[in-house]
Amino acid sequence: MKKIDQKKKLSSEWFRELRNKICQELEKFEVTGKKFRKKKWNRDVKGTNKLGGGEMSVLRGETFEKAGVNISTVFGPISQELKGKIPGSKTAKGFWASGISVVIHPYSPKIPAIHMNTRFIVTGKNWFGGGTDITPNNLNSSNSIKLANYFHNELKEICEKYKKGSYYKYKNWCDEYFFLPHRNEPRGLGG
């Protein structure tokens, strides 16, 4: 097995394991025993059904109005429109990507909504990408300011363990990614 194929297999398995752990932990907050419902899907382009797919996991409970923990592994040709815009795509015959997306909306107005996604992408190059943000109901409350400071301090600590000075680079990317141009504002407390 080629090294890149091993990386693909490991990352895809890791995302599935992570999804299972996140679902198990969130279900513990549901006092009436509500569980995630899972549904598989296929990426169907022009009726081929051979371009990967994933599994949606959705929980509607008493604690969480809606929580989604979704995984996917997709692949296929790179469109001419995207050739050269994605690292490694100029020479690649196609792409492969596997990832997880988590979106949680609690019922309590005191608990913010949270979004997180991460993925492993393979073209002529390969890398991990992703981001996270939180959105409280009242962005300007003193609790939201404390929450924003805590959230960003935790992210900074994680990033700095990975590579010194990387937090601000990644924060700027997330702030751009999570910007809502139609509202001319960042989503939530920034990424």
Predicted regions and their residues:
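A short small-residue
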Residues: 1-3, 190-191
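Gly/Pro-rich turn-and-neighbor structural signature
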Residues: 3-87
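Short, well-ordered alpha-helical packing segments
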Residues: 12, 19, 23, 101, ...
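Hydrophobic/aromatic-lined pockets within catalytic cores
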Residues: 23, 27-31, 108, 119-122, ...
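Internal mixed beta-strand/loop scaffold within catalytic domains of large alpha/beta enzymes
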Residues: 54-130
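Glycine-rich, often proline-containing surface loops adjacent to acidic residues and nearby aromatics
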Residues: 96-98, 127-135, 185-191
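Compact, glycine/acidic-enriched structural inserts
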Residues: 124-169
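A contiguous, surface-oriented mixed alpha/beta subdomain in the mid-to-C-terminal portion of proteins
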Residues: 163-191
